[in-house]
Structures are given as structure tokens and as C-alpha cells.
Amino acid sequence: MSVSVERFGQGPDLVLLHGWGMNGAVWHGIAQQLAAHYRLHLVDLPGFGNSPLREGSDYSLPWLAEQIAIVLPQKCHLLGWSLGGLVASQLALTQPERLHSLITVASSPCFMARDEWPGIAPKVLTGFNQMLAGDFRQTIERFLAIQAMGSEHARDDIRQLRHWLAERPAPQFAALEAGLGLLADVDLRDELLQLSLPWLRVYGRLDSLVPKASIALLDERYPASHSVVLEKASHAPFISHPQQFVEIVRYFVG
């Protein structure tokens, strides 16, 4: 298993993990601004972009975190968007000594709605699984639309996401299927109570995948962490509000 990483820039090491269905090129819209201050590491998660997934791989969250740990600098700031936020959180729990800080973007320790927990409705994830079996490209298009839903610039956001996605090889079906499984099954709410690293959580108020009702619950659950909500952003705030997003990251990382 070989994890592909695009590296450039100078300064403290900042590793960026993309979300479901995407690849590391999704950060290209803000990469040059960040690279003026940080040594960037844009990772393609296994099965996405230029990181081929071997048949029979155990696509669990601990396994994903282990694969990413292999290509991490000795110590870094780690930023994960959406599903990438789950991977980053797992890494922060299992190898905290490798990280200076954790940043999760439009991510939740528990994506699927459960008793007294707002999240993605189970029927939505079931629907994506069914669509995936029939036409995975159409499924990704649908997911792009949901990610931009609510944004003032939804069409532009989708166009940007589609552009970056097309820069690298299409994702593998096995990774897409397993990734949906992680979004449905993973629940790190209790584990993250023990996290002692500096932790920034960034959200879009209009995000339909990480509903605003969950943000207050997370603020209450993790009082030592910091949260920033972009009022007019949806699930991809670094696409819709790039300048503001870069400023938030720079303020936190330093």
C-alpha cells in the first residue's frame, strides 16, 4: 500500500486530509496561500486519487490512520475535512505524540444520526449505498451537490470541487463503499473526551451533513477545544470562503 502525498511550501508541517469521494487536489484553491507559511502535505487517502487500494485491504478507521501515519512528518499539524476529519481524529487519539495540533473541518465524531444526536439520516446513507452499487460517478455528483447545498455560491462550489476531483484518477469503488460504511458506523464521541491536543473545529452553519444542532453539543462535550462557525458556508468552507478559512487556520496554527 503506497499513500501518495503532494508536498510543497516552507514552514511548519501542515498535513491535509480530504473527504469522501475526493482527493488531495481539493486543497489546491487555498494551497498557495498556505504554502507561503507552511510545508504542506496534501494526502490522497487509500483508494482515492493517486493512492491505489490493494484488494482485500482492511478499510477500517484504525487501518486508515496507520497508513497515513507512515507518510506523516515526524511531527505536524493535522487537518482533516469531513471523512478526513475522522481519520485525523483517530490519528490524534492513537499517535498524539506525532501531532502539534488537530483541526477538523465540517466533520463530526459521529456522522450518522442516533438517539438524541443530530446527524445524517440513516436513510440518506442507505440511499447513497444503493446509488453507489448502480452508478458510482452519479453518486459522487449527488454528494457534491449535497456538500454545496445552502452555500451562496453552490454552483461555483460544485464546479470547483468537480474541477479538483478530475485532476487525479477516479476513486475506487471499494474505497467509496468502505468510506460510506465508516460515515455510518464510526462513533468517536467518547474516545475524543481523552484528547489533550490543541483542537480546532471549523464548521459551516448551512452544512446539511454536519447539522448546526450538533455544533452546540460538541462545544459542550469538548470544552477545551475551539470552534469556529462560518455563517454562510456549507460543507466545504475552504471552497466557498477560502480567504476566511486560511485566516482561521493561520490564527490557530500560528
Curated annotation (Swiss-Prot):
A GO CC annotation given for this chain: cytoplasm
UniProt pathway: Cofactor biosynthesis; biotin biosynthesis
InterPro entries registered for this protein in UniProt: AB_hydrolase_1, AB_hydrolase_fold, BioH, Carboxylesterase_BioH
GO molecular function: pimelyl-[acyl-carrier protein] methyl ester esterase activity
Record-annotated AB hydrolase-1 domain positions: 14-242
Record localization: Cytoplasm
Assembly notes: Monomer.
Function of the protein: The physiological role of BioH is to remove the methyl group introduced by BioC when the pimeloyl moiety is complete. It allows to synthesize pimeloyl-ACP via the fatty acid synthetic pathway through the hydrolysis of the ester bonds of pimeloyl-ACP esters.
Protein known as: Pimeloyl-[acyl-carrier protein] methyl ester esterase
Native source species: Aeromonas salmonicida (strain A449)
Gene that produces this protein: bioH
